[in-house]
Design a protein with these regions (language model features):
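A short glycine-threonine-serine/GTX helix/turn-capping micro-motif
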Residues: 162-173, 196, 227-233, 243-245, ...
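N-terminal helix-loop segment corresponding to the beta1-alpha1 unit
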Residues: 1-192, 218-222, 291, 302, ...
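Conserved PLP cofactor-binding pocket of PLP-dependent enzymes
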Residues: 307-330, 744-766
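Substrate-binding/catalytic subdomain of NAD(P)-dependent oxidoreductase enzymes
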Residues: 185-225, 233, 304, 317, ...
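Aromatic-enriched alpha-helical interface/lid elements that frame and gate functional surfaces
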Residues: 232-311, 315, 399, 657-746, ...
Length: 834
């Protein structure tokens, strides 16, 4: 059992939208206490459900997301229970909640009230749209976060209805952002000596971050282009009706042609046609696509995957849940397990923890029965003027609320000496060997919060992110919009690791570092001479994080991988989209955005462990395993009932109607790349019978609210096809923004499906999301980048630009490594640097 967060107490006030945050902290060793209302939290009643169990214990979401936690029951509307809660706050480190903005203030439990009891308390709030802005009181669910965050727009078939990702990806991203923020804030408080802080996590902004590659803002600001579906999702149907996920890179193009020749596919290409394999190559008339389809027409799924492996292409099979348990890759790595639930008298199916990278492992214990740990409730105590006892953050509570016209209060400066977020990790040095997205985004998070992150790279084998287009349409190593977003705030040390001198420099640099991060294939670091045994001989307490695409072992361990291909092999794609369409998944490389927060959480947890024990450790954080672990609710339902979960398109088991409906376009008129009418959409999600009655009245059809076909959730689900037709007919002639606002005014969650133009120019809630940075050699070029998801209330957290290639060579060699100017010049002359 991981003990990294031993001694940390978390009060968890979350619903489904934030429950994963507390689960991650519990898996890392924190004591996480669910504070539930009488009758239990709403997550206990969600579908899918275990069969033949009492109502409060049957929800798979509760059993999976609340594993390793404890449960107490308190009515926070009751005076005595509020005092009992405050007494618990006095001994807590974190409170995580999903309550609507101002809800806890109305109960006398706002941030100031909590800090008055415990000035070292960290509060993290996860809400649909954050604590500030015009939309802060709007209701929101995963569907609306995906719509307003730009993810749904890039997901689905090019001419089809946009699709929501399976297994609630916006809830996942918000929860993971909260968990990583908790580790950052704990580090700041305990290492910098600061007091508590209130951290704001918006599900919408967490979602916007996931489209940073598919919908990089500079595509719009420099190229006048709006990315369209299907984004970065590519799957191919094979001869046996199975599917594979495939990416053909330019450096493997000739091997692809050789494979086509061996199979007998006539492709008509030569090595000179490699540009057709670029990600941004035209889709129409692409001979690479034609050759791929020809291969798939004569090969089964497994034959295709085996041939691609032989050609060293990035390819994995698209797997469903019925494939996973017995697949060698997952069996070898013990991906799935069962947990005994004695009170229920049964075994429950689980997936390995998302943070199982910890060297001391993660043991999973069953979720608590309602009120099982009531003995932990403290007696009411008089409130101190200020507290010095370490406290814990609670998990989010209710994600939705009826929109009101309450004015948005201006953020107030903290009254206590909380650490500035930009200095939260000051004093930590990270050597970043990361490549492309997954690891570099994680180290960007560390850099944004004050760690010194030194990116080790080389002009001789540059990261593909260094080849992004600049404002003039040609590749530029320093100006690329995505590169600047992914590497904001870092330093760059350009060195040739293939030379003895270069390797010696990096080895010496690591000797003064706290952690080393990489996302190479297993064994690559050892072959470079930088394996864990070597690093321990350099610095005994070093923390090394390896983040391979698949696992350390198994047939896929040595394969090249990309996020969207891993997504396809995880089971995710078979939970997403319409049953009659290709299982594309969503239009982003999903693991590239879940993994960074897990990287931050595990690295900081390992450093916390080192602080207490003096021990470093090697962490193995599989991107594939991490994504599979995020499908645990669906996996548990499948294991308990045997029913294969299907692709439910935009429908939901707990909300109905719940979908993406046709609408009209922006009232501001056309925009670059807009195809005109026919591709504008609005999302609507009804969570209760009362909300359905309100929506029916808004539609001018109040009789539908009490119609037996639609009066209850079960009735609406039975008649969902007819219901969707009614909703679509109502939304079709409305502007998507106005329609969503009308729904919100009557208490129904709704949001426009936003494209890049909408998120960058139109959405008032995202007005401050994009920050502008400049490079010294191009001061007039505005480069928009995404700000951090976790906003520390009361602070202006501005990010720095990314480094120019080799910008900090002299700093590293002379200041950090203590070499002379003459030595530095020799390294340049001998081509060791650069």
């Amino acid at each position: 059992m991981s003990t990294a967060l031993d001694g940390i107490r978390v009060l968890d006030l979350t619903d489904r939208s934030g429950a994963l945050a507390g689960r991650v902290l519990a898996d890392l060793g924190a004591e996480v206490i669910l504070v539930e209302p009488p009758g239990g939290g709403s997550i206990r009643r969600l579908r899918p459900q275990l069969r033949r169990e009492r109502e409060s214990e049957r929800s798979c979401a509760h059993q999976y997301l609340n594993a390793n936690k404890k449960s107490v029951v308190l009515d926070l509307a009751d005076d005595q229970d509020r005092e009992r809660f405050l007494a618990m706050v006095a001994t807590a480190d974190l409170v995580i909640d999903t309550e609507r903005p101002d809800r806890l203030d109305e109960l006398g439990l706002g941030t100031d009230d909590l800090l008055a009891v415990n000035e070292r308390l960290i509060r993290i709030s996860i809400t649909p749209y954050g604590q500030h802005g015009e939309w802060r009181h709007r209701k929101g669910v995963d569907l609306t976060a995906g719509a307003s965050g730009g993810l749904i727009w890039v997901s689905g078939e090019p001419k089809g209805t946009p699709v929501q990702g399976g297994a609630d990806p916006s809830y996942v991203m918000g929860s993971l952002a909260a968990a990583s923020a908790a580790l950052v804030a704990l580090t700041a408080r305990d290492e910098q000596g600061g007091s508590g802080v209130h951290i704001d996590v918006s599900l919408q902004e967490a979602t916007v971050m996931t489209v940073m590659q598919t919908a990089t803002p500079t595509l719009l600001t420099w190229q006048g282009r709006i990315p369209r579906r299907p984004g970065l999702s590519a799957v191919v149907r094979c001869a046996d009706d199975g599917y594979v996920g495939l990416l053909i890179r330019p450096d493997r193009f000739e091997r692809f042609l050789a494979w086509c020749d061996a199979v007998g596919v006539d492709h008509g290409m030569t090595a000179a046609d490699w540009e057709w394999s670029l990600l941004n190559a035209p889709r129409q008339g692409n001979p690479v696509s034609a050759a791929t389809l020809a291969l798939a027409s004569v090969l089964t799924r497994d034959e295709f995957a085996a041939g691609a492996l032989e050609a060293d292409l990035v390819c994995l099979p698209v797997l469903g849940f019925d494939d996973l348990a017995d697949h060698e890759q997952y069996v070898v790595n013990e991906q799935f397990l069962t947990v005994r639930h004695d009170p229920l008298g049964r075994e429950l199916g689980f997936v390995r923890s998302p943070v199982d990278a910890m060297a001391d492992g993660v043991v999973i214990s069953r979720a608590p029965m309602l009120g099982e740990h009531q003995h932990l409730v403290s007696r009411p105590v008089s409130r101190p003027v200020s507290g010095s006892v370490s406290g814990s953050a609670q998990a989010p509570g209710s994600a939705g609320s009826v929109m009101t016209t309450t004015p948005d209060p201006a953020p107030t400066a903290p009254t206590r000496s909380a650490t500035h977020p930009g200095q939260a990790l000051a004093g930590l040095r990270i050597v970043d060997l990361g490549w492309v997205l997954a690891a570099p985004i994680g180290t960007r998070l560390l850099a944004s919060f004050g760690a010194e992150v030194i990116r080790v790279e080389s002009s001789r084998k540059p990261d593909s992110m260094r080849n992004q287009l600049g404002p003039d349409g040609t590749p530029d190593p320093d100006l690329g919009g995505l590169f600047n977003t992914v590497n904001a705030g870092k330093k760059s040390f350009a060195v040739d690791l293939s030379t003895d001198e270069g390797l010696a420099l990096v080895t010496e640099l690591i000797a003064g570092a706290d952690a080393v991060v990489n996302n190479f294939r297993p064994g690559a670091l050892d072959r470079m001479g930088l394996g864990y045994k070597t690093l321990r001989s350099i610095k005994e307490d070093i923390v090394l994080l390896n983040m391979p695409g698949a696992h350390r072992k198994g047939p896929w361990a040595v394969r090249s991988s990309m996020g969207n291909i891993l997504m396809a092999a995880s089971g995710f794609n078979m939970l997403t989209g319409f049953p009659d369409e290709r299982p594309r998944g969503i239009g982003i490389p999903y693991p590239d955005f879940t993994s960074p927060h897990l990287l931050v959480a595990t690295v900081l947890a390992a450093l916390r462990h080192r602080k207490r024990t003096g021990e470093g450790q090697e962490l193995h954080l599989s991107q594939l395993s991490g994504v599979v672990s995020l499908l645990g609710v669906e996996w548990m339902a499948y294991q308990s009932g045997g029913d294969l979960p299907g692709r439910r398109a935009n429908r939901d088991l707990n909300q109905c109607p719940h979908g993406v409906y046709p609408a009209q376009g922006s009232q501001d008129g056309d925009y670059p790349g807009h195809d005109g009418p026919g591709d504008e959409w609005v999302t609507v999600a009804v969570s209760s019978d009362e909300e359905w009655e309100a929506l029916a009245s808004l539609m001018g059809r109040p009789e539908l609210g009490t119609d037996d076909r639609f009066r209850t959730l079960d009735a609406r689900k039975t008649n969902e096809d007819e219901l969707d037709r009614l909703i679509a007919a109502w939304t079709a002639d409305q502007d998507k923004w106005a329609c969503a606002e009308r729904c919100q005014l009557v208490g129904v969650a709704a949001a426009p499906v936003e494209n890049l133009w909408d998120t960058y120019h139109r959405d008032p809630q995202l007005r401050h999301h994009y920050q502008i940075v400049h490079q010294p050699h191009a001061p007039d070029v505005d480069i928009p980048i995404d700000r951090e998801i976790a906003q520390w209330i009361g602070f202006d957290h501005r990010l720095n630009r990314s480094p120019m290639l080799g910008e900090h060579n002299e700093y590293v060699v002379r200041e950090l490594l203590g070499r002379s100017e003459a030595d530095y010049i020799d390294l340049i002359v001998n081509d060791v640097l650069g």
